[in-house]
Amino acid sequence: AGACVLLYRLVLAVGSAHRARWATALFAFAPTGFLLQVAYAESLLLVLLFGALLALVRRRYWLIAPLGVVAAFTKPGVLALALALAVHLVVRWAGARRSVRAAEVFPWRDRIAIVVTGLVVAAAGLAWPVIATAVTGRPDAYLDTELSWWVGFVGRQHFAPLTPWFIMASTWLGPLGIGLVVVVLAGAVWFFSRRSTRALGTDVLAFTASYGLYLVAVFLPQQSLPRLLLPMAPLLGSDVFVGTRRRAVTWLVVGVCLQPIAIVLLWFLGYP
C-alpha cells in the first residue's frame, strides 16, 4: 500500500492525476502484483525507492540519504539512485550556467547536498562486497555468491559487466538469442527516447534508465526478471501505457489476466 501511495504521488508530481491514477492501478494489478502481498523484500525496497525519487523530484536531497542507505541494505540496485543524482546534478548545473542568476537558480547548499547524498548512497550500494570480504577474508566472496545462482542456468562463468544477458541468450538460443537481446535493447532505447517517456521528467528518466542499465550490466535474466523490473514502475505513467483511457484499460485487463499465470509459473511451479 505504501509503494502504491508513493508511486501515485511521484507520477502526480511529474505528470497529471490521470497518469498517476492509471500508473498506480497498472502497478498494483500487474502480473507480479501478487509479490506485494508476500514476504519478499520488494515491498520495502519499492517504498524506499519511490520515496527517494519523490524527494529528488521535490529537491529534498537530505531525505534521500537515509532512504537510499536503508534501500541498499534491503536489496541490490541502489547504485542506480546514485547515478540518477549525478545526472540531476549535471542537469541543474548546466541550467544554472545559462542563467545570469546562477547562485539563485542552483545555490551551493543544493550542490553540496546532492554531492554528499550521492556519495553516501553510492557507498551504501557498494557496501555488501566490502562486508562479505571483511567477514570471509575472501575478496571474491560476494561475487562468487552471486555467480553461484547462475550455475543452474549457464554453468560456471566468469563475470564481466554487460555480458550476462548475452551469456544467457547464447547458452539457450545460440546466435538467435544474441539477436533477440539486441532487439530488446534497441526497443528500450526507442522507449526511453519517446517524447511521452521524456515527459516524465529528467529525474524519473535518469533513475529508470540507470536501473535498467544496472540490470543489463550485472543481472542474469531468468524467472526473477519480472520481479526485478518493479522499480521501473514510474514508467507506467508514459503515454505508451496510459495515453488514452482505452489504452490504459487494455493494459489493466492484460495485467489482471496474466496474474493467475504468473502466480502458477512463479510461485507454484517455480520461484519469483
Task: Report residues per predicted region.
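Transmembrane-helix motifs of polytopic, lipid-linked glycan transferases
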Residues: 1-14, 186-193
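Specific aromatic-rich, kink-prone transmembrane helix
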Residues: 6-9, 26-29, 44-63, 82, ...
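Transmembrane-helix signature of polytopic, membrane-embedded enzymes
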Residues: 7-29, 200-202, 206
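Signature aromatic-anchored transmembrane alpha helix within multi-pass, membrane-resident enzymes
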Residues: 118-122, 244-272
